[in-house]
């Protein structure tokens, strides 16, 4: 085996994947995670590093013979042995890829949204956290059902599927999955504990203790962490004004390059896009401030604060409320897959967020579900028809404008925004919801 070097920062859960895989395959791998070999935030921004790894992200792997790999799952696949990849069984190989993709798409995003605020890495958002909890419940439910008659995810031995999902669930189990939360998912916890106690896992992770009490957002910890990130930006302009107090004209352009330097490639690409025409430019200014309502909805109680605010400030002359129902319920199978339809639509409609709000709900169970939602748009036309940027997935739904003063509209807004109520028009129980804001 040629071996190679893995660049990362200490305790990077993504780096655990290739490191555990290397324990099983006996692949010789050197870890560079501290000076002078590697310092995160400095080394990964140098021209030499970016030439090898253009995104500047870690973990990143450089083989002893000079080739380079990025993305933790790809690195783990490379350093693994055939058994971890699914042996010579094509079905097992496909199933390993399936669970690795499942981990990246369905576990990591909600896990990050829930756990990061408890670590002081991210600001707390009540609505995002509650939504993440519901998504994690769905994920754990899928895994629990699959593991009911299985020791491991694929076949009879540990594979990259087990390694990847264990690493993705690691911080959940360490920070927030307290006993009462994880109790309904006993098969998952049994499997997780089995994995982390394997010698190859313990060599990388050490002893893993499951949390006793769900960690909460710590404002003090967040305040301590955040200034460290901002320090480089503050130091540059602080020095320049002292030298250029009398030169007012030259002082203003000096800091200009800094924001551009801070943009990653995707942000630069977005900044370079031509500006689209505003479909609502012809409408008079509205007194209803959508962003303010979204703040209320995200951070305050829905029934006692957000909804009263909505109806107090909603301007029916400049805004409209629509009911949408998915046209093809007979095609909906697994509930987590149905939720992907909603999430995918939301992601592709990012340019509509500024002037819209929606609560879309999945009702029912596996192979017997429906999707419907309530949307709020600027103006009185169906928003999707007004811009090419917005013409995404909306034709898969039937749309009906609601009369904002009607009892039907008031009831629907209350039930869909609060995710609770009788939902008499649906005839199925609430499963889970998604918010577009």
Curated annotation (Swiss-Prot):
Annotated EF-1-gamma C-terminal domain residues: 276-437
GO molecular function term, any single one: translation elongation factor activity
One GO BP annotation of this record: translational elongation
Biased composition regions of type Basic and acidic residues, renumbered to the chain: 225-240, 266-279
A GO cellular component entry from the record: nucleus
Residue span(s) of domain GST C-terminal: 89-222
Function: Probably plays a role in anchoring the complex to other cellular components.
Protein name: Elongation factor 1-gamma-B
UniProt gene name: eef1g-b
């Amino acid at each position: 085996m040629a071996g190679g070097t893995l660049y990362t920062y200490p305790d990077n859960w993504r780096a655990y994947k290739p490191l555990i895989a290397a324990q099983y395959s006996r692949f010789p791998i050197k870890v560079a995670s501290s000076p002078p070999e590697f310092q995160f935030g400095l080394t990964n921004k140098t021209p030499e590093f970016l030439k090898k790894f253009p995104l500047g992200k870690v973990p990143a792997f450089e083989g002893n013979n000079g080739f380079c790999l990025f993305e933790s799952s790809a690195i783990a696949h490379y350093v693994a042995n055939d058994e971890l990849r699914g042996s010579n069984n094509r079905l097992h190989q496909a199933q390993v890829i399936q669970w690795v993709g499942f981990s990246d798409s369905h576990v990591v995003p909600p896990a990050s949204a829930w756990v990061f605020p408890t670590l002081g890495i991210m600001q707390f958002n009540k609505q995002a956290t509650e939504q993440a909890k519901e998504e994690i419940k769905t994920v754990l439910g899928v895994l629990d059902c699959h593991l009911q008659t299985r020791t491991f995810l694929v076949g009879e031995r540990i594979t990259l599927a087990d390694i990847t999902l264990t690493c993705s669930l690691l911080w959940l189990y360490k920070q927030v999955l307290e006993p009462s939360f994880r109790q309904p998912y006993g098969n998952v916890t049994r499997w997780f504990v089995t994995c982390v106690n394997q010698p190859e896992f313990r060599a990388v992770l050490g002893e893993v203790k499951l949390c006793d009490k769900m960690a909460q957002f710590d404002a003090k910890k967040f305040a301590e962490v955040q200034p460290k990130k901002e320090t480089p930006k503050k130091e540059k302009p602080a020095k320049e004004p002292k030298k250029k107090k009398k030169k007012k004209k030259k002082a203003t352009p000096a800091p200009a390059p800094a924001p551009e330097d801070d943009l990653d490639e995707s942000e630069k690409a977005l900044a370079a896009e031509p500006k689209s025409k505003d479909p609502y430019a012809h409408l008079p200014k509205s007194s209803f401030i959508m962003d303010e309502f979204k703040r209320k909805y995200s951070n305050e109680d829905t029934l006692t604060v957000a909804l009263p605010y909505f109806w107090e400030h909603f301007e029916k002359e400049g805004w409209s409320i629509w009911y949408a129902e998915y046209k093809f319920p007979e095609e909906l199978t697994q509930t987590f897959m149905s939720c992907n339809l909603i999430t995918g639509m939301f992601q592709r409609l990012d340019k509509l967020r500024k002037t819209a709000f929606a609560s879309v709900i999945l009702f029912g169970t596996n192979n017997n579900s429906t999707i419907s939602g309530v949307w709020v748009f600027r103006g009185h036309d169906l928003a999707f028809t007004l811009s090419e940027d917005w013409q995404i997935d909306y034709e898969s739904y039937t749309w009906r404008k609601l009369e904002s003063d009607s009892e039907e509209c008031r009831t629907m807004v209350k039930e869909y925004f609060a995710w609770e109520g009788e939902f008499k028009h649906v005839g199925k129980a609430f499963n889970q919801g998604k918010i577009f804001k």
